[in-house]
């Protein structure tokens, strides 16, 4: 495999690469191999550790002080990764220590490297057995239960955020949108929300204030369905279209089931023709009865009536893969200690403290 070639090596020992036209600066013991992921929030490269040959992923979070809200989001992601340790959550090795507190603009995370993700597996159209589905989904719900028991909700679960190795080991990644597990106001999700196809009714409710950890259960339910059929189950093109697709699938909700929606969302649904619920047994004829029974308890219109992640793991569908040690609660709730940040100077100080505390020098 052709590796990326460094452009220069600084006296400090840092290697400089050009990755997708941007400067990528890593410690001398790492050789970058290739880009494995990129987006608005950062770029991820695979790398090899000199000497040991260990393969890792290095994520560059760029221009962390460009926007205060975005910087606080990045800080939250970093704090969650340093605080929560579980086999089904991506493991952070350490942060690379910048040369100067006063001048650093980017943050580099060294993490476990995975071979692929569920999005690539689904798009490859490779044949998945029911055992594959059981094993993937029990791991996803183990990781999710651990997050929820730490009072954190992910809020952006989608197939590309579920990483997979050749041995089918799975880990949840990308905690950039994660928040404390509490009822959120609609304004909290205005800028950052679950990718549309995986949004539950309460996020599409146009004014609903009932955002809880149940949003993650809905998202994993849709991923489960996607694994069954090899395509997105609800590929809506906008908010209204997404809500219509949900109603077409689950049937027209009762007045009680719409109690969490805004008046506008309720009025829209009531203006539509009444729809009966579709049969999951007919929609997924290849699936077992236990699989469709579980799915029917995940894709529930009212968030309070969905199973919790803990209840999901107790479902008979997963009886073969139950493991009490992997299903334990987090020892402590996640605590966000940075509510005081109101300036970029305060953000710089707190980011530096976290990076220093978890840099390789302090491992």
UniProtKB/Swiss-Prot annotation:
It catalyses: L-seryl-[protein] + ATP = O-phospho-L-seryl-[protein] + ADP + H(+); L-threonyl-[protein] + ATP = O-phospho-L-threonyl-[protein] + ADP + H(+). It comes from the Eukaryota. GO terms for molecular function: ATP binding; MAP kinase activity; metal ion binding; protein serine kinase activity; protein serine/threonine kinase activity. The modification Phosphotyrosine is found at residue 192. It is an enzyme of class 2 (transferase). Keywords: ATP-binding, Kinase, Magnesium, Metal-binding, Nucleotide-binding, Phosphoprotein, Serine/threonine-protein kinase, Transferase. InterPro entries: Kinase-like_dom_sf, MAP_kinase, MAP_kinase_CS, Prot_kinase_dom, Ser/Thr_kinase_AS. Optimum pH is 6-7. A motif (TQY) lies at residues 190-192. The TXY motif contains the threonine and tyrosine residues whose phosphorylation activates the MAP kinases. Essential for the two main proliferating life stages, the promastigotes and amastigotes, of the parasite. It holds the Pfam family Pkinase. PROSITE patterns: MAPK, PROTEIN_KINASE_DOM, PROTEIN_KINASE_ST. Its cofactor is Mg(2+). Dually phosphorylated on Thr-190 and Tyr-192, which activates the enzyme. This is Mitogen-activated protein kinase 4. Belongs to the protein kinase superfamily. CMGC Ser/Thr protein kinase family. MAP kinase subfamily. Can use both Mg(2+) and Mn(2+) in vitro and shows higher activity with Mn(2+) but Mg(2+) is likely to be the in vivo cofactor. Its EC number is 2.7.11.24. It comes from Leishmania mexicana. ATP binds at residues 36-44, 59. The modification Phosphoserine is found at residues 186-187. The active site is at residue 156.
């Amino acid at each position: 495999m052709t590796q990326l070639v460094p452009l220069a090596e600084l006296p400090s020992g840092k290697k400089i690469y050009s990755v997708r036209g941007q400067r990528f600066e890593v410690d001398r013991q790492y050789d970058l191999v290739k880009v494995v992921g990129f987006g608005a929030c950062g770029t991820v490269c695979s790398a090899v550790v000199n000497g040991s040959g260990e393969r890792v992923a290095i994520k560059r979070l760029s221009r962390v002080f460009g926007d205060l809200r975005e910087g606080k989001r990045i800080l939250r992601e970093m704090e969650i990764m340093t605080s929560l340790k579980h086999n089904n959550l991506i493991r952070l090795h350490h942060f690379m220590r910048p040369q100067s507190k006063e001048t650093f603009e980017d943050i580099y995370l060294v993490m476990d490297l995975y071979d692929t993700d569920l999005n690539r597996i689904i798009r490859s159209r490779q044949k998945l057995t029911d055992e594959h589905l059981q094993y993937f989904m029990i791991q996803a719900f183990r990781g999710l239960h651990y997050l929820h028991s730490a009072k954190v909700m992910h809020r952006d679960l989608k197939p590309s955020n579920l990483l997979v190795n050749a041995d089918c080991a799975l880990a949840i990644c990308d905690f950039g949108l994660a928040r404390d597990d509490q009822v959120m106001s609609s304004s909290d999700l205005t800028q950052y929300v679950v990718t549309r196809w995986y949004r539950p009714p309460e996020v599409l409710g146009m004014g609903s204030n009932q955002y809880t950890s149940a949003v993650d259960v809905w998202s994993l339910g849709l991923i489960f369905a996607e694994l069954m059929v090899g395509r997105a189950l609800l590929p809506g093109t906008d908010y209204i279209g997404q809500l219509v697709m949900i109603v077409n699938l689950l049937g027209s909700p009762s007045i009680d089931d719409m109690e969490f929606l805004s008046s506008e969302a309720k009025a829209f649904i009531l203006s539509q023709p009444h729809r009966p619920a579709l049969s999951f047994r007919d929609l997924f004829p290849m699936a077992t009865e236990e699989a469709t029974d579980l799915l029917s308890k995940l894709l529930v219109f009212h968030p309070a009536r969905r199973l919790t992640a803990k209840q999901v793991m107790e479902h008979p569908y997963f009886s073969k893969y139950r493991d009490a040690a992997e299903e334990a609660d987090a020892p402590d709730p996640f605590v966000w200690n940075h509510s005081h940040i109101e300036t970029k100077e305060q953000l710089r100080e707190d980011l530096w403290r976290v990076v220093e505390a978890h840099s390789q020098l302090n491992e």
